[in-house]
Design a protein with these regions (language model features):
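Conserved catalytic or regulatory cores that recognize and/or transform ribose-phosphate-containing ligands
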Residues: 1-149
């Protein structure tokens, strides 16, 4: 199974360790195409470990990520930190009819976007612990594999 994991990069890296934990756990279910999102050394400037010292340009990142999004079997996003890029990816994922799960934590003053919570193509789920997030992801992956989603 090819998994596309989405999480904030340029909008902030406060949740990078959460992404890393989720991605490490998701590897037991298949290939995580975007595992760099969980790299704690990845800065808000982007994935500079690729291509050249200053990092790949925006067009390269866009085209690479769109190829991964097209190739994936499902999308899992951690959307607690709002991100324009993640929103773009989720919009395309729904157009491509990919199964999409968005996980988020409740943080005062930062409600889930109505465009995520109200989308019929997106399953959104609140979690308060990593164990709960893993249970939600496992159920989503199993239902996707069984063709229920």
């Amino acid at each position: 199974m090819k998994i596309y994991f989405a999480g904030s990069i340029r909008a902030g890296r406060d949740d990078a360790t959460i992404y890393e934990t989720m991605i490490t756990w998701l590897r037991s279910y298949g290939e995580v195409l975007t595992e760099h999102v969980g790299n704690p050394l990845l800065s808000a400037a982007g994935d500079g470990h690729l291509k050249v010292a200053c990092g790949p340009d925006n067009r390269y990142i866009h085209d690479r990520d769109m190829a991964w999004l097209t190739a994936c079997d499902l999308v899992i996003a951690e959307v607690t930190t709002p991100s324009l890029g993640v929103g773009y990816e989720l919009g395309w994922a729904t157009v491509l009819e990919k199964p999409v799960l968005c996980l988020y934590r409740i943080i005062a003053g930062r409600p889930l976007s109505a465009m995520i919570g109200g989308s019929p193509g997106i399953q959104a789920a609140e979690y308060s612990s990593m164990d709960e997030a893993k249970r939600i992801m496992e159920e989503f992956i199993k239902k996707t594999a069984e063709g229920i989603i």
